[in-house]
From Swiss-Prot:
Changing C552R: Abrogates both sequence-specific and methylation-dependent DNA-binding. InterPro entries: BTB/POZ_dom, SKP1/BTB/POZ_sf, Znf_C2H2_sf, Znf_C2H2_type, ZnFinger_BTB_dom_contain. It comes from Homo sapiens (Human). This is Transcriptional regulator Kaiso. Expressed in vascular endothelium.
Length: 672
């Protein structure tokens, strides 16, 4: 009997790629069958994913529908939990929110987050700042949550300083080692982890080659040159990088170093290809010429919130990174410029950045006058960039150096590529999503004025413009004084900024907005009540006049409004008044008695005559007017008092009408 072998194969990357694909579908809104409302935010997700990750959702979805509202958790915390469910990672959570995150994880039944406090309690510091001195690493079996705690050793042995263990990733990291480089920063009052600060670096005219300034890169396939980066956990949801020219560094030659730190550096080289999602931000500007293999310098006094993660695909021994301690106590001029800040939402994290050199060549980091680091995507990565939301042509302001700033303002261009899984509110503080209709369709509001509802907007440097084929589906909404223009799939809707009612006609919205502004007032002619709309006043005056305009065609009875007439037709005649056959007649409003007249010539000595029934007719010139008509002096100008006939014992009310407006009332029956 012939023996046969049974072959089994396991794809160790399948679970990660599957989870990444589900996260991308969530970002695009594909196949999402549940909406979770937390505070004022809506989160689209999949029931199967949430129920499999949370015992709370597993029990809730057995009885709940497609819309679920959570009142016991904040939106910021739920966004972190949802990102963990779809990425198996917790990314850059502030330490003051950690207790609330763990408590929310216990309420939702997310086991990993609920028991996250056990391994974290064994770490001496969670701030992420490097400290001098020896620290003991955690035992590999502490906390059975498959939590990987890595301790990196400095490649430069002359430093001799070790760095405390840093929690980098959670769950399986088989055949993957992440390279991290820790920047020791000085104390800073700014504790906002969601803001990234970079320094404005002027190009040096002369550079001296030294061991401290050269990143030696071997000519292996796919080498990677890495400049000043700090560790930060990356999230599958693409973030928005905040780059702010806040510091200015002097340009002596001896200060141009690769990394200016007061402590040791932390390097962790990747030994296997890592799967990266399209969480890339491209910032392309015309770089200044820099000698090869010489990287630019960064200041040694940087805010503690600078955290950049580099995840590179490379072969073993493909990159040799050299970094030593630089000169200490160098003078720096710190310039705060908040106007050039591109802020991000609290949910955002720092994007994955990498420098891509050419094959068999060396590549260095280059900076322009406004310190926009050139970051490109590795060509060997398979990333579906066609599913990304591209926002380009963001004009930057002039930097402190007018010559350099104006040059790159004309020549440079920043292209920001955002995956649609990001929170669109992270584009700026004033942005707000009003519609997410269809696949990969996002409509954003950029307020012009500062108001408490919409936040503070900086239109001069933050209004993006869509590019390419996405121009048809993704458009920006412009805010006016009284409304938003919401563009969805080519159709324009005008949304009132006060009550959020939508209109398809701008004139209808203008008339509606008078309810909030009261620019025009329509007082009742019979009492002291005032109305913001003319139709409101007309409906009210019907009760004074008792006029019955709605007449039933079946029996001839008249009614004061449509509701009474409709109930009469249904109950007495057993008919539907809103059907195809018209069962009632709407008579014109006779209380105003508007004259119907033809064109008047200047030679006419009379005005159109009016009978008692309110029907007017033209009076020929030179003929006697009929009995009951009034005459006027020749060449008398026509006024509103001539058109409207005053009722007996009624006082004349003269309304203050603004210039350019009329007093005609358009009565629309309720059945229309």
């Amino acid at each position: 009997m012939e023996s046969r072998k049974l072959i089994s194969a396991t794809d160790i990357q399948y679970s990660g790629s599957l989870l990444n694909s589900l996260n991308e579908q969530r970002g695009h809104g594909l196949f999402c069958d549940v909406t979770v409302i937390v505070e004022d935010r809506k989160f689209r997700a999949h029931k199967n994913i949430l129920s499999a990750s949370s015992t709370y959702f597993h029990q809730l979805f057995s009885v709940a529908g497609q819309v679920v509202e959570l009142s016991f958790i904040r939106a910021e915390i739920f966004a972190e939990i949802l990102n963990y469910i779809y990425s198996s990672k917790i990314v850059r959570v502030r330490s003051d929110l950690l207790d609330e995150l763990i408590k929310s994880g216990q309420l939702l039944g997310v086991k990993f987050i609920a028991e996250l406090g056990v391994p974290l309690s064994q770490v001496k510091s969670i701030s992420g700042t490097a400290q001098d001195g020896n620290t003991e690493p955690l035992p590999p079996d502490s906390g059975d949550k498959n939590l990987v705690i890595q301790k990196s050793k400095d490649e430069a042995q002359d430093n001799g300083a070790t760095i405390m263990p840093i929690i980098t990733e959670s769950f399986s990291l088989s055949a993957e080692d992440y390279e991290m480089k820790k920047i020791i920063v000085t104390d800073s009052d700014d504790d906002d982890d969601d803001v990234i600060f970079c320094s404005e670096i002027l190009p040096t005219k002369e550079t001296l080659p030294s061991n401290n300034t050269v990143a030696q890169v071997q000519s292996n396939p796919g080498p990677v040159a890495i400049s000043d980066v700090a560790p930060s956990a990356s999230n599958n949801s693409p973030p928005l990088t905040n780059i702010t020219p806040t510091q200015k560094l002097p340009t002596p030659v001896n200060q141009a170093t690769l990394s200016q730190t007061q402590g040791s550096e932390k390097l962790l080289v990747s030994s296997a290809p890592t799967h990266l999602t399209p969480n890339i931000i491209l910032l392309n500007q015309t770089p200044l010429s820099t000698p090869p293999n010489v990287s630019s310098s960064l200041p040694n006094h940087m805010p503690s919130s600078i955290n950049l993660l580099v995840q590179n695909q490379q072969t073993p021994n493909s990159a040799i990174l050299t970094g030593n301690k630089a000169n200490e106590e160098e003078e720096e001029e710190i310039i705060d410029d908040d106007d050039d800040t591109i802020s991000s939402s609290p949910d955002s994290a720092v994007s994955n950045t990498s420098l891509v050199p050419q094959a068999d060549t060396s590549q260095n980091t280059s900076f322009d006058g406004s310190l926009i680091q050139k970051m490109q995507i590795p060509t060997l990565l398979q990333e579906p960039l066609s599913n990304s939301l591209k926002i380009s042509d963001i004009i930057t302001r002039n930097t402190n150096d007018p010559g350099v700033g104006s040059k790159h303002l004309m020549e440079g261009q920043k292209i920001i590529t955002l995956d649609t899984a990001t929170e669109i509110e992270g584009l700026s503080t004033g942005c707000k999503v009003y519609a997410n209709i269809g696949e990969d369709t996002y409509d954003i509001v950029i307020p012009v004025k500062d108001d408490p509802d919409e936040g503070e907007a900086r239109l001069e440097n933050e209004i993006p413009k869509t590019s390419g084929s996405e121009m048809a589906n993704k458009r920006m909404k412009v805010k006016h004084d009284d409304h938003y223009e919401l563009i969805v799939d080519g159709r324009v809707y005008y949304i009132c900024i006060v009550c959020k009612r939508s209109y398809v006609c701008l004139t209808s919205l203008r008339r509606h907005f008078n309810i909030h502004s009261w620019e025009k007032k329509y007082p009742c002619r019979y009492c002291e009540k005032v109305f913001p709309l003319a139709e409101y006043r007309t409906k009210h005056e019907i009760h004074h006049t008792g006029e019955r305009r709605y007449q039933c065609l079946a029996c001839g009875k008249s009614f004061i409004n449509y509701q009474f007439m409709s109930s009469h037709i249904k109950s007495v005649h057993s008919q539907d008044p809103s059907g195809d056959s018209k069962l009632y007649r709407l008579h014109p409003c006779r209380s105003l008695q508007i004259r119907q007249y033809a064109y008047l010539s200047d030679r006419s000595s009379t005005i159109p005559a009016m009978k008692d029934d309110g029907i007017g007719y033209k009076v020929d010139t030179g003929k006697e007017p009929p009995v009951g008509t009034t005459t006027s002096t020749q060449n008398k100008p026509m006024t509103w008092e001539d058109i409207f006939i005053q009722q007996e014992n009624d006082s004349i009310f003269k309304q203050n009408v603004t210039d350019g407006s009329t007093e005609f009332e358009f009565i629309i029956p309720e059945s229309y």
